[in-house]
């Protein structure tokens, strides 16, 4: 029989219950027992939503208090020794691993965090050593599975596969071949399967998303040997791939001794024919035909026609599902009461997407007539979107068509600009700055909420925001920072803020998705041509600059990041949408410069995450991404200093594209990786200024002055002294004021020590060392 199933459901809860509960636990306001009870309630709610929608096989094990990769590491005992020694409680150990601090007060350096493939979700990077051992260490998956079965759900446990788990981790200390760990790891996986089998589970979903990557031959071979060795203890295994095409890994995937294969049709429709021709006759094919990464409703008529053709070949060996876990979309469109009615009709969130998969499955089982009403209603929606006049703006399209190369070049090369900027800005050696945002207190959030709800008028709102800006400027001046920011109190999110002010973009009320841990974001929805009708940031930056003689940065989010962190229209190339955004930002940049702003930051933290997973597609993306950044940034004079910021990025393979952005200063996230990211600059002489993140803002832990100095000295191995900036890893929005002021004070002290220790006339040698400074 054709089944509807799902790969994973959002964890955060319809009202972000996960976020509120876990943060209460971190603050010591609730017990661990209360924490676990909320986990039970959230999972039961998620299972009920899916079952009522008509999903046959319910994913179990997709819930997490922080991250599913971290959960897998804890489950198999891959816990770094620095956490094992300090925590006896497994839950606190997990939180300490992710945050560098546990609710029991234990502190140490957190594990690295990075992007989950090309999404805006972040995972905690497992750490492996040459003497790594594994053991079954956590029973969370078995408890959840038992709970689902007791509540009469047909549970399909979900785990990250062994090869993807190893691939996503990193060697700590001495480098070695991670595949050597399989011998110790596979028995633990077998133990997991044995326990799931004993509970009466029929199917297990094993996620191996790295099968859509360019894999080295030894990793391809490792798939064959690993899955031949794995003992599933009579469980049926659905091997799940997503985010791209199997491509050259298709043949080996079809040889694996598993019972079913899931493919992502939405991201890689061209692979379908090859999969159908190579899939062994006994295997199930799960077709991910409902987009798990975007919010547009499915064209059910078109999808059903495609599935009917597949069914004619496979019969009951066809399953229907979303393309990937629904972790990447909001939970329930029914919670949106303020969206324009026509726009809302075009969307589908997680609850609606599992219903779409179920509708299609029913159509296959019982014939089109059984879902005739749904098909008719859906067809009306599809036509409405295609013919709506609100999507196209002739003025925007004309402006985009007129873009030429001249608009994407600064007046002179960086060396000339550098001299002019140095004379104008009068900055010291090792200039200090922050990335943009300052702590968003409950007072600020309540102020914005009251303003949006009409409880306070424009005048009072402006007065209160100005007070916040003045306070932030005063704190930075007192701390001794060199280039200041206004703190962004008016912004709820670095992308959503611009989404609210640009035409062609819609904002939801409850469209939250998980970014990392308890951090949730509300991505804008780009539904039509994008344009700027009026200045978006000017009044706040002008006011901030009026309070100080030091330079205050204009703060913008770049075109690629706005694109990456939004749900994007799918009726034109993404590059075209990015160009429209870049033109809107260009107007804003020029307005800021005309007002006297001397430093303008255009953040592109998502620049690398948008890189296609397959290298063959990189050149095309990098070409248009670089052009869009330059289109946004190059309309200014030499004297205006352009900054950009990037995070969670490995630069080795795209360093030339980073240089091609031609930003005067780039700040990058690097502290968690202990400056490893700077190895990119060993063989490539990056020509412009760099500010490698000198402390980790994602952890509440405050670094010692000596630690900051040590990282800066390490950075000087790769960056000439006259080009090195001192700054945090990222924005400070999620930190509290006590942490922020103390950490920045230490950062400024470290910069002062560095200025004393290093001559401004000479570039230091690599082996020059500082004595540890006191804190």
UniProtKB/Swiss-Prot annotation:
It comes from the Bacteria. This is 5-methyltetrahydropteroyltriglutamate--homocysteine methyltransferase. L-homocysteine binds at residues 435-437, 488, 603. It catalyses: 5-methyltetrahydropteroyltri-L-glutamate + L-homocysteine = tetrahydropteroyltri-L-glutamate + L-methionine. L-methionine binds at residues 435-437, 488, 603. GO terms for biological process: methionine biosynthetic process; methylation. Zn(2+) binds at residues 645, 647, 669, 730. Catalyzes the transfer of a methyl group from 5-methyltetrahydrofolate to homocysteine resulting in methionine formation. Pathway: Amino-acid biosynthesis; L-methionine biosynthesis via de novo pathway; L-methionine from L-homocysteine (MetE route): step 1/1. It comes from Coxiella burnetii (strain CbuG_Q212) (Coxiella burnetii (strain Q212)).
